[in-house]
């Protein structure tokens, strides 16, 4: 199959054949040959050739193409959502919101370019100081599987607006979504070579990341892979490296009047997208005592009734399958490890079928675990930690090398003010789920959760570099010469 998009044309890959499957049914979704090292070379060379003309194109002309892409996303919303659902297992209702977010981020990215980059002029005594922004050149974009349309475009859209050209390596678990998205870019009128698609598994990614002709690498994915990339580019300051990675995110539940509202937000935080959002709550901190007991009883009751089904089931389920049978088995293994360390099961996770990705929402009380592993389990595995007071809750919440998202459910604003001042995370929410984020706000975290702020407003910052100039339209001698100069 012609599954690579290089220099404006679909081409056959010369790498190994691989396939994606619907994790809820096992049916094949996509099959094709990945990109070899030579294919990656051709893709980077194509992007390099296209850079001069694309970066010289008027900003309004670049934005017009990007806006046309957004319009086509709206027109083709159902087809793309169906592909997302088939390949990732997420329910159609959620896949549709992903496509809508892809389209909405375009206007945000254009506004961000104007407000955070663009051009600024300031008069000086003998001319004008001008701040402009220049694109880096050829950038590699690595996309994840959990939002295979939305998250890569959080890098691609601002990169293209700024004048960069792109080589896109999607997750090997969602190649069909990548192909469908690139087809929309092609139909939007993107010139040949401006966006190139290299499908493939690990070897393709290594070839792209190691290429000496890329000027930047923008990555969304696991902290382990991002850390390897960070180590790889040590000693290469010329490479712009933007990493958006995972988190071991805490949600602190305080005594609140509306227990059902707190349970709802905890369910959304822990189990939305089958727990496959980097901002999902992995640890839910619950107070000791009667209120905490009532909260946990209600939380377990609601979680036990969450349905998980195929992406196009009618009625629609809250959760679909996780991305693969292998991912499901890893989650069950992670649960077993926590149980061995002393965790108490409240709802135990089980894999419905060893050949599929269905697992149930699960809850473990890990309070008895003396040394709780600081790990991100990417699925519906909620860990309960009981705490004594607010200081104890914040200390436990901050006991992580990650720092992506955190949340507080509390009626008392003074509690919130203390929490927001002392918690360490890039996204900190009050009486909202931990995975709720504004498109117009920075998205990203501290510590092992990454650097920069991709996917939204601040993405413009790493897609172009500032160029400062002091300018005068007339060449003339200064009124006063420096000491020691004689003309």
Curated annotation (Swiss-Prot):
Which EC number(s) does the record attach to this protein? 1.2.1.71
GO biological process, any: arginine catabolic process to succinate
The annotated active site, in chain numbering, is 244, 278
Q: Establish whether keyword NAD is in the entry.
A: yes
Quote the pathway field. Answer: Amino-acid degradation; L-arginine degradation via AST pathway; L-glutamate and succinate from L-arginine: step 4/5
Q: Which Gene3D superfamilies match?
A: Aldehyde Dehydrogenase, Chain A, domain 1, Aldehyde Dehydrogenase, Chain A, domain 2
- What's the domain of life for this entry? Bacteria
| One of the Pfam families matching this protein, by short name | Aldedh
Top EC category: oxidoreductase
Write out the GO MF terms: succinylglutamate-semialdehyde dehydrogenase activity
KW Secreted (keyword) present? no
Binding annotation for NAD(+): 221-226
Per UniProt, the keywords (alphabetical) are: Arginine metabolism, NAD, Oxidoreductase
Could you tell me what reaction this enzyme catalyses?
N-succinyl-L-glutamate 5-semialdehyde + NAD(+) + H2O = N-succinyl-L-glutamate + NADH + 2 H(+)
* Record-linked InterPro entries: Ald_DH/histidinol_DH, Ald_DH_C, Ald_DH_CS_CYS, Ald_DH_CS_GLU, Ald_DH_N, Aldehyde_DH_dom, SuccinylGlu_semiald_DH_AstD
Q: Which residues form a coiled coil?
A: none
PANTHER family, per the entry: ALDEHYDE DEHYDROGENASE-RELATED
The protein's matches in NCBIfam families, at most eight in alphabetical order, are given as: arg_catab_astD, PRK09457.1
Say which family it is in.
Belongs to the aldehyde dehydrogenase family. AstD subfamily.
> What role does it play?
Catalyzes the NAD-dependent reduction of succinylglutamate semialdehyde into succinylglutamate.
Recorded protein name is N-succinylglutamate 5-semialdehyde dehydrogenase
Native species: Burkholderia mallei (strain ATCC 23344)
């Amino acid at each position: 199959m012609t599954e690579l998009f290089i220099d404006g044309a679909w081409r056959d890959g010369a790498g190994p054949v691989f396939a994606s499957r619907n994790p809820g049914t096992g049916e094949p979704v996509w099959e094709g040959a990945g990109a070899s090292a030579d294919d990656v070379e051709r893709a980077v060379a194509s992007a390099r050739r296209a850079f001069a003309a694309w970066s010289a194109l008027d900003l309004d002309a670049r934005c017009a193409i990007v806006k046309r892409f957004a319009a086509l996303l709206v027109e083709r919303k159902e087809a793309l959502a169906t592909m997302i659902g088939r390949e990732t297992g997420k329910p159609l209702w959620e896949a549709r919101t992903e496509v809508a977010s892809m389209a909405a981020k375009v206007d945000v990215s254009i506004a961000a370019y104007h407000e955070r980059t663009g051009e600024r002029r300031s008069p000086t005594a003998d001319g004008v100081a001008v701040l402009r922004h220049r694109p880096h050149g050829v950038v590699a974009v690595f996309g994840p599987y959990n939002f295979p349309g939305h998250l890569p475009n959080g890098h691609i859209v601002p990169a293209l607006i700024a004048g960069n050209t792109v080589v896109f390596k999607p997750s090997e678990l969602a190649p069909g979504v990548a192909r469908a998205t690139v087809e929309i870019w092609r139909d939007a009128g993107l010139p040949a070579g401006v966006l190139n698609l290299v499908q493939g598994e690990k070897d393709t990614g290594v070839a792209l990341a190691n290429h000496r002709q890329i000027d930047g690498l923008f990555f969304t994915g696991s902290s382990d892979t991002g850390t390897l990339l960070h180590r790889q580019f040590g000693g290469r300051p010329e490479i712009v490296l933007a990493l958006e990675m995972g988190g071991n995110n805490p949600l602190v539940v305080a005594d609140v009047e509306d227990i059902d509202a707190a349970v709802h937000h905890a369910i959304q935080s822990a189990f939305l997208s089958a727990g496959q959002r980097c901002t999902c709550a992995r640890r839910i901190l619950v107070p000791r005592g009667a209120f905490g007991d009532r909260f946990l009883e209600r939380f377990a009751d609601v979680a036990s009734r969450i349905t998980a089904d195929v992406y196009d089931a009618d009625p629609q389920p809250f959760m679909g399958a996780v991305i693969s049978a292998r991912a499901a088995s890893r989650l069950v293994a992670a649960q077993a490890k926590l149980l061995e360390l002393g965790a108490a099961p409240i709802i135990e996770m089980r894999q419905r079928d060893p050949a599929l990705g269905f697992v149930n929402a699960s809850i473990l009380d890990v309070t008895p675990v003396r040394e709780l592993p600081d790990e991100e389990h990417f699925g519906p595995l909620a860990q309960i930690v009981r705490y004594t007071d607010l200081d104890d809750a914040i200390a436990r919440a901050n006991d992580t090398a990650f720092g992506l998202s955190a949340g507080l459910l509390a009626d008392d604003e003074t509690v919130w003010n203390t929490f927001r001042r002392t918690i360490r995370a890039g996204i900190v929410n009050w009486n909202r789920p931990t995975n709720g984020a504004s498109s117009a706000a920075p998205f990203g975290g501290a510590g092992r959760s990454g650097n920069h702020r991709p996917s939204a407003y601040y993405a413009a910052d790493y897609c172009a570099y500032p160029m400062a100039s002091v300018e005068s339209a007339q060449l003339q001698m200064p009124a006063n010469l420096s000491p020691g100069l004689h003309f």
